[in-house]
Amino acid sequence: MNQTWRTHLQSKLQQLHERGQYRNLHVTEQAEETWLIRDEKRMLNLASNNYLGLAGDERLKEAAIACTRKYGTGATASRLVVGNYSLYEEVERSICDWKGTEKALVVNSGYTANIGVISSLVSRHDIVFSDKLNHASIVDGIILSGAEHKRYRHNDLDHLEKLLKTASPEQRKLIVTDTVFSMDGDTAYVRELVELKEKYGAILIVDEAHASGIYGSGGAGLSHIEEDLAQKIDIHMGTFSKALGCYGAYLTGDAIYIEYLHNMMRSFIFTTALPPGTLGAVQKAIEIVKEDNERRERLIENGAYFRNHLREAGFDIGNSSTHIVPIVVGSNETALRFSKRLQQVGIAAIAIRPPTVPVNSSRVRFAVTSQHTIADLQWAIHHIIRIGKEEGFFV
């Protein structure tokens, strides 16, 4: 290996070690279950995005197997070549029915959806307004686009409006936000964002990755909680990899947006399509979440139970109002120590550090699912509070 490169890489890795930001891969089995095996230890799974427990659902497995047997293991090409199986059109029609939109586009992941849609729609003459806590894929899409990037303070609509007023009349304007923020568990003010985008002539993209399948009518997303709100949003992005228990993502909105993305979105054009088995599982998952109100209600109840007990105990859980509950502890070292102690007693909860979250806001992030029992959560809460007291986390 080139010695200059070796020295450079070793130096960068050493810096990560010193800052407490070095990351390791850990072998995990049965992550689709309520209890998993991590580094050969059985733990209560409070770390996954399998919010409705569908990743291990037999109906999804059977659908994936049936489509794999019929169509094979791989799509064999990009969708614009010969990889556009009829399954794609079936899933996209289901998404439109679910979301009440004209047209949809299924893509390979939430990351490729966000970097692709943003970098396709705007360029260096345009301006993007993005919540400061938006997902990294949104930030990367803006960087790729070359557009002017204005970050507004988290959920601060007054700051956003102030920034909107600074835009040149000649600039095309895009507002983009997560609806459920993945590291904080709070939610965006979607109606107010719609009002601002209409007032200032912008378009609005919402990332429903952590809301799809959970909130709104039939689990269509947070933007569907209020009647008629969703139709005023230009583009909805959501994923199949969280509450739906599969893999992939979608973009949906007016037909002209999707037609444009077919022709301009590089992360769609230049990649092999999803495997048929994945599409079969996705189609089944959409059918299930549209009808299964019980899972959604149980998830929301479990989230409230877990969240309220931790808040009452004195932990800093920020403004969490969902199934995602962080305990913010500050330093990288403290978050790592807290996570390690939880894993030692059998709780899988992972330390989240910069650059995933802002400096000095490292945390342990808990993700509750519909499959957790109250007994599971009570057991976890007991140990979290005990360890929290020993570590002095209470304010």
From Swiss-Prot:
Could you state one GO biological process linked to this protein? biotin biosynthetic process
Q: Which UniProt keywords apply?
A: Biotin biosynthesis, Pyridoxal phosphate, Transferase
**Which PROSITE patterns does UniProt cross-reference here?**
AA_TRANSFER_CLASS_2
- SUPFAM superfamilies of this UniProt entry? PLP-dependent transferases
One MF annotation (Gene Ontology) recorded for this entry:
8-amino-7-oxononanoate synthase activity
Cofactors needed by this protein, per the record, are: pyridoxal 5'-phosphate
Origin superkingdom: Bacteria
* Residues binding pyridoxal 5'-phosphate, per UniProt: 110-111, 182, 207-210, 239-242
Residue positions where N6-(pyridoxal phosphate)lysine is found in the record = 242
Q: In which pathway does it act?
A: Cofactor biosynthesis; biotin biosynthesis
Entry keyword Cell cycle = no
- Residues bound to substrate are 23, 135, 356
Entries under InterPro entries matching the protein? Aminotrans_II_pyridoxalP_BS, Aminotransferase_I/II_large, AON_synthase_class-II, AONS_Archaea/Proteobacteria, PyrdxlP-dep_Trfase, PyrdxlP-dep_Trfase_major, PyrdxlP-dep_Trfase_small
| Kinase in keyword set | no
Which reaction does this chain catalyze?
6-carboxyhexanoyl-[ACP] + L-alanine + H(+) = (8S)-8-amino-7-oxononanoate + holo-[ACP] + CO2
EC number(s) per entry: 2.3.1.47
Function noted in UniProt = Catalyzes the decarboxylative condensation of pimeloyl-[acyl-carrier protein] and L-alanine to produce 8-amino-7-oxononanoate (AON), [acyl-carrier protein], and carbon dioxide.
Instruction: Summarize the subunit comment.
Output: Homodimer.
Assigned protein family: Belongs to the class-II pyridoxal-phosphate-dependent aminotransferase family. BioF subfamily.
The protein's name in its UniProt record = Putative 8-amino-7-oxononanoate synthase
